[in-house]
């Protein structure tokens, strides 16, 4: 039988973890100063007077390179616990991890062929 009271701790955790950021944003909005002068709206560069426009546009290749890095960084985060418990998990989990790695390799080959990894 499906018992809902077994999930009371989950719902309490979900509600509390949702209320904390909402409450933090609300409190910072209430306590923040309202008037913002031109000095507050200028960019801050370590106490030095800013030279030129602070807003500059980056090329898309930097974002693509960062995206590929994040994908493989997340892959490492997922594969490390799997490697530590490889002997306990069995063959089915090995096959799932192999499929996961193969999908990432296909993505890497796609990014490589599209030129996302070329720096020049």
UniProtKB/Swiss-Prot annotation:
Membrane topology: Multi-pass membrane protein
Compartment list: Plastid, Chloroplast thylakoid membrane
TM spans (from-to): 9-29, 64-84, 88-108
Gene3D superfamilies per record: NADH:ubiquinone/plastoquinone oxidoreductase, chain 3
EC number: 7.1.1.-
A Gene Ontology molecular function term of the record: quinone binding
Enzyme class, first EC level, given as a word: translocase
Name of the molecule in the record: NAD(P)H-quinone oxidoreductase subunit 3, chloroplastic
Record carries keyword Transmembrane helix: yes
GO annotation, biological process: photosynthesis, light reaction
Family stated for the protein in its record: Belongs to the complex I subunit 3 family.
Oligomeric form and interacting partners: NDH is composed of at least 16 different subunits, 5 of which are encoded in the nucleus.
Main location class: plastid
One GO location term (cellular component): NADH dehydrogenase complex
Keyword terms, alphabetized: Chloroplast, Membrane, NAD, NADP, Plastid, Plastoquinone, Quinone, Thylakoid, Translocase, Transmembrane, Transmembrane helix, Transport
Short name of one Pfam family: Oxidored_q4
Function according to Swiss-Prot or TrEMBL: NDH shuttles electrons from NAD(P)H:plastoquinone, via FMN and iron-sulfur (Fe-S) centers, to quinones in the photosynthetic chain and possibly in a chloroplast respiratory chain. The immediate electron acceptor for the enzyme in this species is believed to be plastoquinone. Couples the redox reaction to proton translocation, and thus conserves the redox energy in a proton gradient.
InterPro entries the UniProt entry points to: NAD(P)H_OxRDtase_bac/plastid (IPR023043), NADH_UbQ/plastoQ_OxRdtase_su3 (IPR000440), NDAH_ubi_oxred_su3_sf (IPR038430)
Catalyzed reaction equations: a plastoquinone + NADH + (n+1) H(+)(in) = a plastoquinol + NAD(+) + n H(+)(out); a plastoquinone + NADPH + (n+1) H(+)(in) = a plastoquinol + NADP(+) + n H(+)(out)
């Amino acid at each position: 039988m499906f018992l809902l009271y077994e999930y009371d701790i989950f719902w309490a955790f979900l509600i509390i973890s949702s209320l904390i950021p909402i409450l933090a944003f609300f409190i910072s909005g209430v306590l923040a100063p309202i008037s913002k002068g031109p000095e507050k709206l200028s960019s801050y560069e370590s106490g030095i007077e800013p030279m030129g426009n602070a807003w500059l546009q980056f090329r898309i290749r930097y974002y693509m390179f960062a995206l590929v890095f994040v994908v493989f960084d997340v892959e490492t985060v997922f594969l490390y616990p799997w490697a530590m418990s490889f002997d306990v998990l069995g063959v089915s989990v090995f096959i799932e991890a192999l499929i996961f790695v193969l999908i990432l390799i296909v993505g890497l080959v796609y990014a490589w062929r599209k030129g996302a990894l070329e720096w020049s």
